[in-house]
From Swiss-Prot:
Species of the source: Paucimonas lemoignei
Catalytic activity reported: sn-glycerol 3-phosphate + NAD(+) = dihydroxyacetone phosphate + NADH + H(+); sn-glycerol 3-phosphate + NADP(+) = dihydroxyacetone phosphate + NADPH + H(+)
Pathway assigned in UniProt: Membrane lipid metabolism; glycerophospholipid metabolism
Annotated InterPro entries: 6-PGluconate_DH-like_C_sf, 6PGD_dom2, G3P_DH_NAD-dep, G3P_DH_NAD-dep_C, G3P_DH_NAD-dep_N, NAD(P)-bd_dom_sf
PROSITE patterns: NAD_G3PDH
Descriptive protein name: Glycerol-3-phosphate dehydrogenase [NAD(P)+]
The entry's keywords: Cytoplasm, Lipid biosynthesis, Lipid metabolism, NAD, NADP, Nucleotide-binding, Oxidoreductase, Phospholipid biosynthesis, Phospholipid metabolism
Molecular function terms, GO-annotated: glycerol-3-phosphate dehydrogenase [NAD(P)+] activity; NAD binding
Function: Catalyzes the reduction of the glycolytic intermediate dihydroxyacetone phosphate (DHAP) to sn-glycerol 3-phosphate (G3P), the key precursor for phospholipid synthesis.
Gene: gpsA
Length: 335
């Protein structure tokens, strides 16, 4: 199968490495110099060092080449940008002959508060077969060929089947869903909760506290998702509890590292600079807080993280305030 991946960051590169073993894959990046260097060295030293690019993988900065590669037949076009980069990429695709579009990003667009599928529809319309590939997956492990499971969510059944045929393989299991909203909400909010978990762990508050936070965080994800039209069962799957557990507990999680740094008293700007890569939870926290307020949904953990990130609230005082909240029933509707 012909596959073009637009975006040569860590996740785009990792997926390209995995898929190039079985498919004809083009990996596109914006920088001509960077892509030429990757083609010469057969490695993405900037985002995924130590993982050689397969000889069959074509690395290019030629946008037309990447699109022409999938224009005919059963081609698959994958957007491997951040949420912030999705709209500019979709605008580049306007008027182009593309068969479909699947994105990997997780979050809400800053400013508009839109989910990725809403951004794509706004720019490219509703007729294009489109969907999101998500789930618990660190790029480094995918590049190593370690096992993982993902979910493709799309309204178009043929696109779901195409993505399963393309991505499902010896080390990657792919499940399918038509709940695009649920999969996207799970992928967005779990990043915020990973920051919260990093704060707790950085304050050495113990495993009991971590488990409680993850559990009540899942209730927040579900509450928001249902309000936006998602199905509750989606959050019991890979894009919900699966991605939440990995991002909150895995040492490779950038969002968790943000929380650890905040607990140590580091300024957010310093933490982001040290990471060197995108931590979507930082970008997403304000947007989710605003959306929850508009929908009148209680999301106390999300609000607490946004307060620490943007309002100068103390992590320790914030934790104390969360613990001091009035007891209530344990349910999705309760906060």
């Amino acid at each position: 199968m012909r596959i073009s991946i637009l975006g040569a960051g860590a996740w785009g590169t990792a997926l390209a490495i995995a898929l190039a073993e079985r498919h004809d894959v083009v990996l596109w990046g914006r920088s001509e110099d960077a892509m030429a260097q990757r083609a010469r060295s057969x490695e993405n030293t900037a985002y995924l060092p130590g993982h050689p690019l397969p000889a069959a993988l074509k690395a290019t900065a030629d946008f037309s080449l990447a699109l022409d590669h999938v224009a005919q037949g059963d081609g698959l076009l994958i957007a491997a940008t951040s949420v912030a980069g999705l709209r500019p990429l979709a605008q580049q695709l306007q008027g182009k002959a593309i068969p479909n579009l699947v994105w990997l990003c997780k979050g809400l667009e800053e400013g508009s508060g839109l989910l990725p599928h809403q951004v794509v529809r706004e720019v490219l319309g509703t007729q294009l077969p489109a969907g999101v590939l998500s789930g618990p997956s660190f790029a480094q492990e995918v590049a190593q060929g370690l096992p993982c499971a993902l979910v493709i969510a799309a309204e178009d059944a043929a696109l779901r089947e195409l993505v399963v045929a393309a991505v499902h393989g010896p080390a990657i299991r792919v499940y399918s869903s038509d709940d695009v909203v649920g999969v996207e909400v799970g992928g967005a909010v779990k990043n915020i909760l990973a920051i919260a978990t990093g704060i707790l762990d950085g304050m050495s508050l113990g495993l009991n506290a971590r488990a409680a936070l993850i559990t009540r965080g899942l209730a927040e994800i579900t509450r928001l998702g249902i309000a936006l039209g998602a199905r509750a069962e989606t959050f019991m799957g890979l894009a919900g509890v699966g991605d939440l557990i990995l991002t909150c507990t895995g040492d490779l999680s950038r969002n968790r590292k943000v929380g650890l740094g905040l607990a140590q008293g580091k300024p957010l700007e310093t933490i982001v600079t040290e990471l060197g890569h995108v931590a979507e939870g930082v970008r997403c926290a304000a947007a989710v807080r605003n959306l929850a307020q508009q929908l009148q949904i209680e999301m106390p953990i999300t609000n607490a993280v946004a307060g620490i990130l943007f309002d100068g609230h103390s992590p320790r005082a914030t934790v104390e305030q969360l613990l001091a909240r009035h007891p209530r029933d344990e349910s999705i509707s309760a906060s």
